Amino acid sequence: MHQDHLLSTTQLSREDIETILDRAAAIEMNPDGWEAQYSGTVLGLCFFEPSTRTRMSFDAAMKRLGGRTIDMGSVDNSSISKGETLADTVRVIAGYADAIVLRHPSEGAAKLAAEFVDIPVINAGDGAGQHPTQTLLDLYTMRENVGLDEITVGIAGDLKYGRTVHSLAAALSNFDVRQHFISPESLQLPRNIRYDLHDSGSQVREHTDIESILPELDVLYVTRIQRERFPDENEYQRVAGQYRVDTDILSHADNNLTVMHPLPRVDEIAPEVDTTEHAAYFEQAHNGVPVRMALLDALIGRAK
């Protein structure tokens, strides 16, 4: 990996992705061998939006590498509540930390932050834009279950506002993957992303129902409807609950189908699916630690 920051999956080549995933696999096989690798290193956690998995797995990843974390805490308890700008906030934190993990409600925030600091910035979600570290653990999970070439992936739910979808679709274009996008018409993949996928030569099809395409899929990637991104609550209510994966629907799927979800789920996947062989979303969340350890090693190690 040759970049100073990770802002978008569009900056990653297949080689970049495979290098990080290979390193994550090595870490998972020998997690104890990394404990003193980054003694004295500090990772700044700057979350302007709620987070459970991303925040905690980055915290665990840095500590398992032998480093420490400092957490900005909630926006209400920081100087942002007094009107401090993002640029000023990251400039200050860059004086305390060796890298910054940033989540922000505004698309493009991570790219902006990277312009003001000379330490690595990792985009942990920028509004409806990108979530590249989620994609890396998604790809790791896919590779462990079905591989990353000659597979068919269905991505269902909120494709318009879902940043995990935007990142994943771009990254999958580096591999031999047939991508099927399943959503209500009002939540289709943004036009610019569709154009980019076609320009990359990706095999892409769009659908409005899951059942018709389910038998063809190796992976079904389900996402929640991003209620917090909707400008109109009525629009959200019209599309909420349209896609729900349960054991009845999965009876139409191949026995080897892998069901994934970036979490948190609301009601997109019934709890009864959790105990089936299809469910991989908790494995997916678990993979966040070794993958983010590998990413921190790639970025901070290079910066040092």
Swiss-Prot record:
Annotated catalysed reactions: carbamoyl phosphate + L-aspartate = N-carbamoyl-L-aspartate + phosphate + H(+)
Signal peptide (residue range): none
UniProt-listed Gene3D superfamilies: Aspartate/ornithine carbamoyltransferase (3.40.50.1370)
Keywords from the UniProt entry: Pyrimidine biosynthesis, Transferase
Pathway: Pyrimidine metabolism; UMP biosynthesis via de novo pathway; (S)-dihydroorotate from bicarbonate: step 2/3
Coiled-coil boundaries: none
Disulfide bonds: none
Family listed: Belongs to the aspartate/ornithine carbamoyltransferase superfamily. ATCase family.
Role summary: Catalyzes the condensation of carbamoyl phosphate and aspartate to form carbamoyl aspartate and inorganic phosphate, the committed step in the de novo pyrimidine nucleotide biosynthesis pathway.
Record note on quaternary structure: Heterooligomer of catalytic and regulatory chains.
Name of the protein described by the UniProt record: Aspartate carbamoyltransferase catalytic subunit
Source organism (scientific name): Haloquadratum walsbyi (strain DSM 16790 / HBSQ001)
Gene: pyrB
